[in-house]
Amino acid sequence: MTISHNNPPPLHDQLCYAIYTAGIAIQRAYKPLLDELGLTYPQYLVLNVLWSGDEQTVGAIANALALESSTLTPLLKRLETAGLLRRTRNLSNERQVVIALTEEGRALQHRAGCLSDTLLAASMQTPKELADLNHDVRHLRDAIYSQIGGWDAPA
């Protein structure tokens, strides 16, 4: 693909568009199951962060999801209202809010586990193909952030 600074390639030839629309397709594939769980996709992502390590600060969750804390706060409030997590002040640093799963939030992890099966079936890819793609996209993301700054990818 030849890149011209005067005429961008057609939208369907742009990698950013392919990644963007693939993300939308994945969210649409997940939507029926997320609806059953009573979750939005961003709420599901927040819970995933907590399922991998409970009791995290708002800042740590925001960093893991590449979001601003101010964007995350309304999501956390809705998840707390739904009984899936608790927000408490950090006793050693009152400026920090610590997020912890409730029993109901932990129990939801098992029910949400089938989302990866949904992607596998909808994509018509093998598990290895999806793992390789995941690796490549993460590598691209990390390379871009290493150049532009602004996000420390979680390990």
Where are these regions (language model features)?
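N-terminal helix-turn-helix DNA-binding core of bacterial DNA-binding proteins
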Residues: 17-20, 24-71
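Charged, amphipathic alpha-helical coiled-coil/dimerization segments
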Residues: 77-138
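Alpha-helix initiation/capping motif
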Residues: 4, 8, 12-15, 19, ...
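Generic leucine side-chain signal with a strong bias for well-ordered alpha-helical environments
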Residues: 34, 47-50, 65-67, 72-79, ...
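Alpha-helical linker/hinge and terminal dimerization helices associated
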Residues: 22, 26-29, 65, 108-127, ...
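N-terminal leader segment of winged-helix/HTH proteins
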Residues: 1-37, 131, 144, 155
